[in-house]
Amino acid sequence: MALLNVLIYPDERLKTVAEPVSVFDEELQTFIDNMFETMYHEEGIGLAATQVNVHKRIITIDIEGTKENQIVLINPKILESFGETGIEEGCLSLPGLRGFVPRKETVKVKAQNRQGEEFMLDADGLLAICIQHEIDHLNGIVFADHLSPLKRQRMKEKLLKLQKQIAKNR
């Protein structure tokens, strides 16, 4: 397995809308394994393929971080959503930054698993929030896009400053 490079906001490639997956081969299985490895290494609970510059509709999730309840959603679609909730969200593509994003409390998702078989998933709480966050990535949206223009600009400035510090220390 290999670690993948996570794109950092405001990288324009994060705005790319992902294409559906149609081939479920060994290469896809390896890529999904690498997504999980990257997600755990970066201490995240979810990762969308677009965040690692692969513009396919693939999401990996493990909200407990135990590796025992891994979820793979390929070509996910939210069919129903109910209730209102929201938390201060973070994101591997916006390291160290958080912002409140309103979300639906419960979602019903249709997706495919690693083998291409369709399934339905009812999710609520943190899992529902994570699914919505990652599907946003597949649609070229980062959580900062849900924030006010002023907050979004401040986030960009903080990240650019951080990137300059990292480059300076290399």
Curated annotation (Swiss-Prot):
Protein name, per record: Peptide deformylase
Annotated residues for binding of Fe cation: 91, 133, 137
Upper taxonomic lineage: Bacteria, Pseudomonadati, Pseudomonadota, Gammaproteobacteria, Pasteurellales
Cofactor(s) demanded: Fe(2+)
Enzyme class of the recorded protein, top EC level: hydrolase
Annotated EC: 3.5.1.88
Active site: 134
Record GO biological process: co-translational protein modification; translation
Family that this chain belongs to: Belongs to the polypeptide deformylase family.
Organism for this UniProt entry: Histophilus somni (strain 2336)
TM segment ranges: none
Reactions catalysed according to its record: N-terminal N-formyl-L-methionyl-[peptide] + H2O = N-terminal L-methionyl-[peptide] + formate
InterPro entries for this protein: Peptide_deformylase, Peptide_deformylase_sf
Gene3D superfamilies in alphabetical order: Peptide deformylase
Record function comment: Removes the formyl group from the N-terminal Met of newly synthesized proteins. Requires at least a dipeptide for an efficient rate of reaction. N-terminal L-methionine is a prerequisite for activity but the enzyme has broad specificity at other positions.
